């Protein structure tokens, strides 16, 4: 996956949040 998504996930955000943030 992309770094943005990995970083988002490590921050404790859920999948949908990371898709919106990084998509």
From Swiss-Prot:
InterPro entries on file: Toxin_25
Example of a GO MF term: toxin activity
Tissue localization of expression: Expressed by the venom gland.
Compartments where found: Secreted
Disulfide bonds, paired cysteine numbers: 4-22, 8-18
Site location (Aromatic residue of the functional dyad): 5
One GO biological process term: defense response to fungus
Domain of life, source organism: Eukaryota
Pfam families: Toxin_25 (PF08095)
Post-translational modification comment from the UniProt entry: The two disulfide isomers globular (C1-C3, C2-C4) and beads (C1-C2, C3-C4) do not show activity on Kv10.1/KCNH1/EAG1.
Cysteine amide found at: 22
Record comment regarding domains: Has the structural arrangement of two alpha-helices stabilized by disulfide bonds (CSalpha/alpha 2(S-S)).
Family per similarity comment: Belongs to the short scorpion toxin superfamily. Potassium channel inhibitor kappa-KTx family. Kappa-KTx 1 subfamily.
Protein name as catalogued: Potassium channel toxin kappa-KTx 1.2
């Amino acid at each position: 996956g992309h770094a943005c998504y990995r970083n988002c996930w490590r921050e404790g955000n859920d999948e949908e949040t990371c898709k919106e943030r990084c998509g």
